[in-house]
Every structure is written in structure tokens, then in C-alpha cells.
Curated annotation (Swiss-Prot):
It is a peripheral membrane protein. It comes from the Bacteria. GO terms for cellular component: plasma membrane. Belongs to the UPF0161 family. This is Putative membrane protein insertion efficiency factor. InterPro entries: Membr_insert_effic_factor_YidD. Could be involved in insertion of integral membrane proteins into the membrane. Pfam families: YidD (PF01809).
Length: 76
């Protein structure tokens, strides 16, 4: 079971690493939070696994808009 969870985490991290490596450098910084949403997602997935980590990441991304919050928002 732990092997499956670890595999799922790595699978979910792949698009985030792709985004950080190839897409993010081409766009101006736009995340309103510290750490950035992609860094938050990486930390949440590594800390909580695929279930809770993915849920926390999605909730954070949904809060990251011009009328949402801003500032320091660490992974709980």
C-alpha cells in the first residue's frame, strides 16, 4: 500500500515539476501567496500523500485569484 501511495505522489508531482521547469519561467510571477502554489502543492503532496495533499493543493489554487487572499500561507 505504501508503494502505491508513493507512486501516486510521484505521478502527481510530474506535472507540477513540468510546470515549474518549462512554463513558469515564461510567465510573470502571479501567485499571491508565499510559498507559491506549485511549491505548496509539492510540499502538501509529500507531507500528506495523494489524498489529502491533492485536496489541499486544489483548495489553495482555488483561493489564488485577484479577489482571494494573499500573504504567507504554509502547508498545515
Amino acid at each position: 500500500m505504501r508503494l502505491i501511495k508513493a507512486f501516486l505522489v510521484q505521478l502527481l508531482l510530474l506535472p507540477i515539476f513540468f510546470y515549474k521547469r518549462f512554463i513558469s519561467p515564461l510567465t510573470p510571477p502571479s501567485c499571491r501567496f508565499t510559498p507559491s502554489c506549485s511549491s505548496y502543492a509539492i510540499e502538501a503532496l509529500r507531507k500528506y500523500g495523494p489524498g489529502k495533499g491533492l485536496l489541499l493543493s486544489i483548495k489553495r489554487i482555488l483561493r489564488c485569484h485577484p479577489w482571494g487572499g494573499s500573504g504567507y500561507d504554509p502547508v498545515p
